[in-house]
């Protein structure tokens, strides 16, 4: 019984396991990848979730232009969303779900779509005249 408890507690905990899975949903958006990732991360952090508030983290790949946003709840990786620019100034987004992330895909994808329609934040100092 202890083994079963330990195994069930470890299911889905490993971010590497989530990253190794095929994406459940993929899309391309006409928004710079940094802006889309930042907006998505902020909305995931502030939206209400049926299970409670997840811990949301992000990382930028050092070898290529790729941002990863992932949510953790109760020491388990719920999902990861990756943002990567394309050659045509678009962003490819991929959603992967962890073992305990059931019920998060629709809400997460709705956040991504919402963020893709938002205006770009103003550039600091853009309203100044030389």
Go through each PLM region and give its residues:
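Sequence contexts marking disulfide-bonded cysteines in secreted/extracellular proteins
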Residues: 11, 38-40, 114-116
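C-terminal partner/receptor-binding element of secreted or periplasmic proteins
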Residues: 92, 96-130
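Post-signal-peptide N-terminal segment of Sec-exported extracytoplasmic proteins
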Residues: 25-67, 78
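Bacterial Sec signal peptide processing site at the extreme N-terminus
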Residues: 4-25
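Mid-chain, structured segments of secreted extracytoplasmic proteins
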Residues: 61-94
